[in-house]
Amino acid sequence: MAYNVYSFPDVKAVLNHPDIGQCSLHQSGMGKITVSAAGDLASHTTTADGYVIVNRLKTTNGTITVEVPQGSIADWFLRKWARWARSLQDPSRIALGVLTVTDTVGGYTISATGVSLQKVPDRVFDRTAGTVAYTFLAATVSEQ
């Protein structure tokens, strides 16, 4: 009998930005990463006589949500990115990051380029530390 194994400790995630620097999220308090495609890969058009046409759609962009423990090194790095993005006065100055997520056990890598912070995350102040969710837009998301 064959088994498939998923091992979160074997997932490596690196976020790189030309002005902010690089953060190995897997060594800095990564909580959870969700990669979502922005569009559909196909759609159907039905003609008047009932014939179905399959439309192949080319979408490569998506969103990435990175949840990290409040107060972690990853949270510090991502807050730094948010402060940098808020302070930009010249829109031509925007620099885009790259996120690479590698599942060494599963044997695949997700690469996201043209990564920009969508908004400054909500902050919750409670008796115990929680998680902070940072949402990024990516111009291109691919999987190898």
What is the predicted role of each segment?
Residues 49-50, 79-81:
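N-terminal, charged/glycine-rich beta-strand/loop interface patches
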Residues 80-110:
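Short, acidic/charged, Gly/Pro-enriched secondary-structure junctions
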Residues 73-79:
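Short, conserved charged micro-motifs
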